[in-house]
Swiss-Prot record:
The keyword tRNA processing does not apply. It comes from Mesorhizobium japonicum (strain LMG 29417 / CECT 9101 / MAFF 303099) (Mesorhizobium loti (strain MAFF 303099)). It is an enzyme of class 6 (ligase). GO terms for biological process: 'de novo' UMP biosynthetic process; glutamine metabolic process; L-arginine biosynthetic process; regulation of DNA-templated transcription. ATP 1 binds at residues 129, 221, 227-228, 260, 262, 267, 293-295, 337, 351. This is Carbamoyl phosphate synthase large chain. SUPFAM superfamilies: Carbamoyl phosphate synthetase, large subunit connection domain, Glutathione synthetase ATP-binding domain-like, Methylglyoxal synthase-like, PreATP-grasp domain. It comes from the Bacteria. Mn(2+) 1 binds at residues 337, 351. Residues 620-1031 are annotated as: Carbamoyl phosphate synthetic domain. Pfam families: CPSase_L_D2, CPSase_L_D3, MGS.
């Protein structure tokens, strides 16, 4: 079946901003889909609100819409572009839900758009819990005992009533029929919140019946959500009703499945691809080391599945294919999840995703099989046997089922430290923000590689303190000790695997460990094997012969771990290893277990002696001139997709320039680890040892021009010293200049020399010094550790008690394991040792200042300021969390001139080669330099999409030796970023709903996971789009609540008057209400939470408030208003905590009321 010729244009819906449960794996799949369909000659139309994606690069689609992904906005794009088909399977749950909404709205039928990849019936059958359960029963597959709680009958009755009202109105035929129909629709839409509450109440009554049927503990799974949003495990009735309420609220269909507990069962996933001719292949089997009860995105997983018998595997394989056939996924990839009772082998189907997923990306990277690319081609009519497998160079067709001869381990990365008050317990609702993948010839090797690739300071299965046991406890002799171990192993946490290892070290039997944690005994035996070898190393030291040292390395032991076990330095171990000529060899990911030769250079390291006739090193290093790009490792808050975008652009530009581009990274979600992004990909941890070994192999042939460390965030920068010591050339800005920008003393001298201002500041190398510096500067002040990204542990300190708490509670969380072991019982000693290496930096807090980000390109002489971004929030909120606009929207031109002058002076002084970011604060007309980052920043993709020039590509060419002018010439003339002819607004997206109990108030530590971009000719509309893209539904009418501190009352007045003038009712607390009344605004008084009921929180929970303006002052006021902020979050009420934010949203609402949003492709802005 050749590709279809009856469709010419295809709309792809992206996944939108990076959120927990839906991250950059969908940029990877969407990018593959765009390339695959363009390759086939289709006109590709893309909508995605996330500017940090490769898929939104204008060359990847014919029309690229960076617009909010809402059904209404996508409907406008369909009306404008008239696509023949819609591919909804590449953009996660966002794309599926949007596609289903478009179908329900009649948009697809109206414009004759066909859904391809998975039709609406298949999506409904897979995502609707009732339909899925019926489908599984029909084909003889068991699902856990369950019951649905929904309000389908009530919804249907409401819909019929609404349709009857429309029909009656049409029958009356009034003169103003269209206006009357619009008014009816407006009333219907405004009543959505009230209807939702009725539906939830109705479903809660059914849930009570379900509880009697299913019993406790119970699993709650909301329909049509991602990453387990709103779901969880209930162990008692109170938890049950709380989670059901949350799940019903999260589900767009107000439906949850209440399921019997299968906690402790083994969990497996199958990645399946099916074509129209019913050819089916299993791309990969995945086994979760964590048993059922932990979301698969939060579980440590391995591929292939390691503890299945062949008979069990074949049963699961056949069941997976039967599921796809019954659901009706005809063209593309799907993920099917199973649970197996280890006691009796009972197999149940948990769920399936009728689309590419997080697991699809992992399976693609684990096997080399490009699931998203193949799925896109199947969607347009091809069959698997007609498509070539790129990895084998076409030696095998895509219908050839992948086979692998290695083990892959994925470990998630968490960010609980960013959310004080959040309990670090894992459930069926996903909480991880990133993941690392490692490849080894054995499970032990891949596990230890993954642990060190996490970049959390681990060198392997490092020791850990079990809560409830004394520090350094080595034996569990007492009942209390055993109870502490049981509690630690029985509670799923990010550190549970290390707790398991520690319990085994302390003499707990494997049988007891299994009983406590339910992890399969085979995995426990493998961990015990590592620990037994650790004990031998402690006793006998580092082997002095190559055979035994190679054996240790083949088990995954890093030089740093061996050094820790023998109480020496990693450099000592490395010297012994090099003296014995023990080095890794590099193997290829080839999809066929070496059955066919693979031309694709997708490599991983391992330690083994090659068998007779085999290549010792399959890397096949070329003789070309080459550049190595270090990636960013696992995603985390503060270092995410924006840096991967920069690494990809560097690879693209260098390949275009004739260099061989070599990528090193260990993140399976990203485009940078796609097999065709670079000339050669090394999927290995970003540690000094692993990177230097790769460079050693690459230097065996050809010329290594250098290594790029400034695109991957803080991760590669930390390796700069080791690279320099090894004599490896670093391209672009020198490590010394990068260090100068981080070193407060040196940086201060540079600013003084240049005549630039900075806030009054100080530096502390000890606890005592910190107190002295704070005393000299006075409060409030900003404190942060040096050499961190994302504002890690950065705080605004208001008084002495806050400083004391920061030093004794927050700083110890930064202390690495080696320092803790050196000072086991001396917290002050630990802190002082840490600060000796990474001092604390103190700045006077510039209250009310405007913060500005400036990005620039420099070749050491010439400078181009590519963007000046004005923050909408005032200084004090981390730049990554603040909304900002490009170009500036309120700064006078003379201040912009001064910012450009200071930026150019800094770039020249630091001899920047490539990119530089400067953060400024402007107060009372004075420009203060806050910090300088002579590297890529997270604003690079946003700036590039706004000005229409790929600044990361230009920077890469500069690093390779081109001048700024020559590098720019490849991509068009230098634009004027001050007057691009349009306005772009970047807005941050937060995961607060995932962390109950956490305060949503923003500060200097970054907490957003992603971003969106609003693009328009008008600032108000661009801001409105940014809010819609971030999931904030701006009200067109309703009630505004205002409560602001005294110094903000005058400033808030214009925004309140604007909304009151648009017909909004105003509620206010007593002081604010008096002020508003004195200034001509009618406002109704309402109680604060502490003033008695009914109070403002009651009004918000009763959906009587549609938007909130609230500013606070001082710790007590912040604390007192926390419950108010949580209420707005849970009720999805827009909440603005700054004067500038309030002013911007008031203008945005006015613009929306004045007319509808227009949509334009990126290409139209730069035509």
């Amino acid at each position: 079946m050749p590709r279809r010729t009856d469709i010419k244009s295809i709309l792809i819906i992206g996944a939108g901003p990076i959120v927990i449960g839906q991250a950059c794996e969908f940029d990877y799949s969407g990018t593959q889909a765009c390339k695959a369909l363009k390759e086939e000659g289709f006109r590709v139309i893309l909508v995605n609100s996330n500017p940090a994606t490769i898929m939104t690069d204008p060359e990847l689609a014919d029309a690229t819409y960076i617009e909010p992904i809402t059904p209404e906005v996508v409907a406008k794009i369909i009306a404008k572009e008239r696509p023949d088909a819609l591919l909804p399977t590449m953009g996660g749950q966002t794309a599926l839900n949007t596609a289903l909404s478009l179908r329900r709205m009649g948009v697809l039928d109206r414009y004759n758009v066909e859904m391809i990849g998975a039709d609406a019936t298949a999506i409904d059958k897979a995502e609707d819990r009732a339909l899925f359960r019926e489908a599984m029963s029909k084909i003889g597959l068991e699902t856990p005992k369950s019951m649905l709680a929904n309000a389908t009958d009530v919804k249907n009755a409401d819909r019929k009533t609404h349709e009857a009202e429309r029909a009656a109105l049409k029958a009356e035929k009034p003169d103003n029929l269209d206006a009357e129909l619009d008014a009816l629709e407006t009333r219907w839409n405004l009543g959505e919140g009230d209807r939702k509450q009725r539906y939830i109440s109705h479903a809660m009554a059914i849930a009570a019946q379900a509880l009697d049927h299913v019993g406790l503990p119970a699993i709650i799974r909301p329909s049509f959500t991602m990453g387990g949003t709103g779901g969880g495990i209930a162990y008692n009735r109170a938890e049950f009703y709380d989670i059901v309420q949350s799940g019903l609220d999260a589900s767009p269909t107000t439906e949850v499945l209440i399921e019997e507990s299968v906690l402790g069962w083994k969990e497996y996933e199958m990645e399946v691809v099916r074509d129209k001719a019913d050819n089916c292949i299993i791309v990969c089997s995945i086994e979760n080391i964590d048993p059922m009860g932990v979301h698969t995105g939060d579980s440590i997983t391995v591929a292939p599945a390691l503890t299945l018998t062949d008979k069990e595997y074949q049963m699961m394989r056949n069941a997976s294919i039967a599921v796809l056939r019954e659901i009706g996924v005809e063209t593309g990839g799907s993920n099917v999840q199973f649970a197996v009772n280890p006691a009796d082998g009972r197999l149940v189907v948990i769920e399936m995703n009728p689309r590419v997923s997080r697991s699809s990306a992992l399976a693609s990277k684990a096997t080399g099989f490009p699931i998203a690319k193949i799925a896109a081609k199947l969607a347009v009519g091809y069959t698997l046997d007609e498509l070539e497998n790129d990895i084998t160079g076409g030696a095998t067709p895509a219908s050839f089922e992948p086979s692998i001869d290695y083990v892959v381990t994925k470990i998630p990365r968490f960010a609980f430290e960013k959310f004080p008050g959040a309990e670090p317990v894992l459930t069926t609702a996903m909480k991880s923000v990133g993941e690392v993948m490692a490849i080894g010839r054995t499970f032990q090797e891949s596990l230890q590689k993954a642990l060190r690739g996490l970049e959390t300071g681990l060198t392997g299965l490092d020791e850990i303190e079990i809560p409830g046991l004394g520090h350094g406890a080595t034996v569990a002799n007492h009942a209390d000790d055993r109870n502490a171990i049981r509690a630690a192993l029985g509670t799923p946490t990010p550190d549970r695997l290390r707790m398991v290892a520690q319990a085994i070290r302390m003499g707990t039997s494997l049988e007891d460990v299994h009983a406590m944690c339910k992890i399969d005994p085979w995995f426990l035996e493998q961990i015990a094997g590592i620990l037994a070898m650790e004990a031998r190393i402690r006793e006998h030291g580092i082997p002095q012969d190559a055979v035994n040292l190679r054996m240790l390395k083949a088990m995954g032991f890093s030089d740093a771990r061996l050094a820790s076990l023998t109480r020496t330095d990693a450099e000592v171990v490395t010297k012994i290893r090099e003296k014995l000529d023990v080095h890794p060899v590099y193997k290829r990911i080839d999809t066929c277990a070496a059955e066919f030769a693979s031309p694709t250079a997708y490599m991983y390291s391992t330690y083994e002696v090659p068998f007779a006739g085999a290549l010792a090193n399959e890397a096949q290093v070329s003789s070309r001139k080459k550049v190595v790009i270090l990636g960013g490792g696992p995603n985390r808050i503060g270092q995410g997709i924006e840096f991967d975008y920069c690494c990809c652009h560097a690879a693209f530009a260098l390949r275009d320039a004739g260099y061989e581009a070599i990528m090193i990274n260990c993140n399976p979600e990203t485009v940078s680890t796609d097999y065709d992004t670079s000339d050669r990909l090394y999927f290995d941890p970003l540690t000094a040892e692993d990177v230097l070994e790769i460079l050693r192999a690459e230097q065996a042939s050809g010329e290594l021009l250098g290594v790029i460390v400034q695109f991957g965030g803080q991760t590669p920068l930390k390796l700069a010293d080791a690279l320099e010591k090894a004599g490896i050339p670093i391209l672009g800005t020198s490590p010394d200049m990068i260090d100068l920008a981080e070193d407060r003393d040196r940086f201060q001298k540079l600013l003084h020399k240049l005549g630039l201002s900075q806030p009054k500041n100080g530096i502390a190398y000890s606890v005592e010094q910190a107190r002295l510096v704070a005393g000299e500067l006075g409060f409030p002040l900003v404190v942060r550790p040096s050499y961190v990204l994302g504002g890690r542990a950065m705080q605004i300190i208001h008084d002495e008690s806050m400083l004391q708490s920061y030093l004794l509670d927050t700083v110890p969380g930064l202390v690495p394991e080696d320092i803790k072991q050196k000072y086991p019982n001396d917290k002050t000693g630990q802190i002082n040792t840490l600060l000796g290496k990474n001092p604390l930096l103190f700045d006077t807090y510039l209250s009310g200042a405007i913060e500005v980000d400036v990005d620039c390109l420099c070749d050491g002489k010439a400078t181009f300021v590519s963007g000046i971004l004005e923050h909408i929030e005032e200084a004090g909120i981390h730049s990554g969390d603040s909304a900002c606009s490009l170009p500036v929207h309120s700064l006078p031109s003379e201040l912009v001139d001064e910012l450009e002058r200071q930026t150019a002076a800094l770039a020249r002084a630091l001899n920047v080669g490539g990119l530089m970011n400067v953060q400024y604060a402007i107060k009372d007309g004075t420009v203060y330099v806050l910090e300088v980052n002579p590297r890529a920043s997270r604003t690079v993709p946003f700036v590039a999409k706004t000005i229409g020039r790929p600044i990361a590509k230009i920077a890469a060419r500069i690093m390779a030796g081109e001048t700024l002018e020559d590098a720019f010439a490849h991509y068009g003339a230098m634009p004027d970023p001050r007057n691009p002819g349009h306005i772009a607004v970047k807005e941050a997206v937060f995961p607060f709903a995932r962390f109950p109990g956490v305060d949503i108030l923003l500060g200097p530590e970054m907490r957003s996971t992603g971003e969106v971009m609003g693009l328009d000719r008008d600032f108000a509309l661009a801001f409105a789009k940014s809010q819609l893209g971030a999931g904030v539904d701006l009200p067109r009418s309703g009630t505004l609540f205002v409560s602001v501190r005294d110094e903000d009352k005058k400033g808030i007045l214009p925004a309140v008057k604007r909304l009151a003038g648009l017909g909004f009712k105003v509620l206010a607390t007593s002081g604010t209400q008096r002020f508003l009344a004195e200034n001509g605004v009618v406002a109704e008084k309402i109680n604060k939470v502490l003033e008695g009921r009914p109070h403002i929180e009651d009004a918000i929970r009763n959906r009587q408030v549609q938007i909130v303006f609230n500013t606070t002052d001082g710790q007590k006021a912040v604390s007192d208003s926390k419950s108010l902020r949580r209420a707005t979050l849970m009720q999805k009420v827009p909440y603005y905590t700054t004067l500038s934010g309030a002013a911007a949203v008031a203008e945005a609402i006015a613009a929306l009321k004045a007319g509808s949003l227009e949509v334009r492709p990126l290409q139209e802005y730069f035509a």
